[in-house]
Amino acid sequence: MNLIQLLEQEEIARLTAGKTIPAFAPGDTVVVQVKVKEGNRERLQAYEGVVIAKRNRGLNSSFIVRKISSGEGVERTFQTYSPLVATIEVKRRGDVRRAKLYYLRQRSGKSARIKEKLDYKSAAGKKA
């Protein structure tokens, strides 16, 4: 392992100390709590939408969340390990067959819906 990778791992460990980043994938509906500074006070702003892309590049990892706001599609890119991202919460798992869901940009209404992924393993455990 080279020196740069070692430094990146240390920085990731420092940035994730005290917060957990859940495992999520494209198609999942997530709520990202973002720290917003207004004047001299800071507050958390919730941004809920569908993850349409995820980029795994160590410290430079990021993901794109798309939501419909007032009938208009809005996309926002978040750095996974940014100090401005307070929490990431997975609301719903999506069942998709693509890594990048850019085709959702051309779709609206019911055609832009994503089927929910059913977890058969946990359902079988609850029955027993």
From Swiss-Prot:
Q: Which UniProt keywords apply?
A: Ribonucleoprotein, Ribosomal protein
Record has Ribosomal protein as a keyword: yes
Q: What is one Gene Ontology biological process annotated in the Swiss-Prot or TrEMBL record?
A: translation
A Gene Ontology CC term for this entry?
cytosolic large ribosomal subunit
**Which InterPro entries does its entry note?**
Ribosomal_bL19, Ribosomal_bL19_CS, Ribosomal_bL19_sf, Translation_prot_SH3-like_sf
Q: Does the keyword Ribonucleoprotein apply?
A: yes
Task: Give the highest taxon in the source lineage.
Answer: Bacteria
Give the matching SUPFAM superfamilies: Translation proteins SH3-like domain
PANTHER family, sorted: LARGE RIBOSOMAL SUBUNIT PROTEIN BL19M, RIBOSOMAL PROTEIN L19
Q: Which NCBIfam families match?
A: rplS_bact (TIGR01024)
Instruction: Family membership, please give it.
Output: Belongs to the bacterial ribosomal protein bL19 family.
State the name under which the record lists this protein: Large ribosomal subunit protein bL19
